């Protein structure tokens, strides 16, 4: 019996809720998980099939981003995303959470790059959607359904990904702002929001630190010089360019005991929205992605005492358009699972959940509060 067959059998036979566990690097949502038994997937790893000429690779869900990068680099190829998390995050977690990748090569999202998945449903059925070639569209909607479902509809065990040729240059350029007053942010934010920068950028601030601008350069080396020149208008540009896979700032090293919030706003409201966010959380790590209008706040474990207050703060920040996506995080001894999800509301959602996980055994969330569940977003 294969590992996937054993996994399916366990799901069929369980009488207890299960929480899906990947590499132990991702933040899991909400907790406490009421009587949920861990369902580890880190043994499901390795390359299933790789055809470099087609720019397609199929890997087991427990394969890490670092392992994927090492395999594809040997053929001068790469997975185009650099999502939040660490290089030791698993591909299954990246797909299940549709992990944000704010400095993605070519501005891709997870859904753009997932061609197919193998999933074990809450019924214990092994199913496939999509395929291992770029033009295969069989079951495509089911691929999108499971991407970002946080494991609530099925356990992703295998993923087929679209790859890209590795560019000759792929680095991050960092600029530390000289000024951090309202006037400086007032000058900077409109330019970021209007997308006048020559390349994808982020505004990042470490706890009690000075805001920094991060820009990704992929392809033509001359573009790196253009980005440095652009950033010098705002601050001091680091002399050393950081390779994307060695990023040490906004993309990696989220604390293992933290609370994470994410909120979005329209471009027209971005300047007051981001300024208010930076003021509201002076002790948090904040990252603003102008391309997506998304503000991400990572708060230390001590902030758990003020969780409801911080949640209310993020609601007020997002009130300009009501797009609120809190991801509350509680790490259980370094192990991790999926982010919180709201209970199904529409008839369609109820029907899909019942069809794929009728017993509600996969990643069932024990509510923190009605407020959290009411605004959490799958």
Question: Can you annotate each of these PLM segments?
Answer:
Residues 96, 115-257:
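C-terminal substrate-binding/cap subdomain adjacent to the FAD-binding core in PCMH-type
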Residues 66-68, 180-187, 221-229, 269-276, ...:
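Short, conserved charged micro-motifs
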Residues 12, 19-21, 26-32:
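N-terminal low-complexity or amphipathic/hydrophobic leaders
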Residues 28-45, 71-73, 94:
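Glycine-rich loop at the start of a catalytic domain that most often binds anionic cofactors/ligands
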Residues 32-35, 42, 235-378:
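Conserved glycine-rich FAD pyrophosphate-binding loop
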Residues 19-20, 200-207, 285-290:
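Short beta-strand
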Residues 1-20, 41-87, 99-132, 167-177, ...:
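N-terminal glycine-rich flavin-associated loop
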């Amino acid at each position: 019996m294969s590992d996937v067959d054993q996994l399916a059998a366990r799901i069929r036979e369980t009488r207890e809720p299960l929480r899906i566990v990947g590499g132990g690097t991702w933040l899991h949502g909400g907790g406490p998980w009421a009587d949920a038994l861990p369902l580890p997937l880190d043994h499901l790893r390795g390359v299933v099939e790789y055809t470099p000429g087609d720019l397609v690779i199929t890997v087991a869900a427990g394969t890490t981003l670092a392992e994927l990068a090492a395999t594809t680099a040997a053929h001068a190829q790469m997975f185009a995303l650099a999502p939040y998390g660490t290089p030791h995050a698993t591909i299954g977690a990246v797909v299940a959470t549709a992990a944000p990748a704010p400095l993605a090569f070519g501005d891709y999202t997870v859904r753009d790059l997932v061609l197919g998945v193998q999933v074990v449903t809450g019924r214990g059925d092994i199913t496939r959607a999509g395929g291992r070639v770029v033009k295969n569209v069989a079951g495509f909607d089911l691929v999108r359904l499971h991407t970002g479902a946080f494991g609530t509809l099925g356990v992703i065990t295998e993923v087929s990904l679209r790859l890209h040729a590795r560019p000759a240059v792929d680095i991050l350029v960092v600029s530390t702002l000289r000024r951090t007053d309202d006037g400086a942010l007032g000058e900077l934010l409109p330019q970021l929001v209007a997308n006048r920068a020559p390349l994808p950028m982020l505004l990042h601030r470490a706890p009690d630190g000075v805001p920094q601008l991060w820009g990704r350069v992929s392809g033509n080396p001359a573009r790196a010089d253009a980005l440095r020149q652009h950033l010098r208008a705002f601050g001091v540009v680091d002399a050393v360019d950081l390779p994307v896979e060695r990023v040490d700032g906004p993309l990696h090293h989220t604390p293992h005991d933290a609370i994470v919030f994410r909120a979005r706003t329209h471009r027209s409201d971005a300047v007051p929205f981001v300024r208010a966010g930076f003021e509201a959380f002076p002790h948090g790590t904040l990252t603003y992605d102008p391309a997506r209008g998304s503000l991400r706040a990572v708060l230390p474990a001590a902030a758990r005492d003020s969780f409801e207050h911080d949640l209310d703060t993020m609601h007020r920040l997002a009130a300009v358009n009501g797009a609120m996506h809190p991801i509350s995080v509680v790490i259980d001894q370094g192990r991790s699972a999926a982010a919180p999800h709201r209970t199904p509301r529409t008839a369609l959602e109820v029907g899909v959940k019942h069809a794929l996980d009728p017993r509600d055994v996969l990643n069932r969330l024990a509510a923190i509060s009605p407020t959290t569940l009411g605004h959490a977003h799958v």
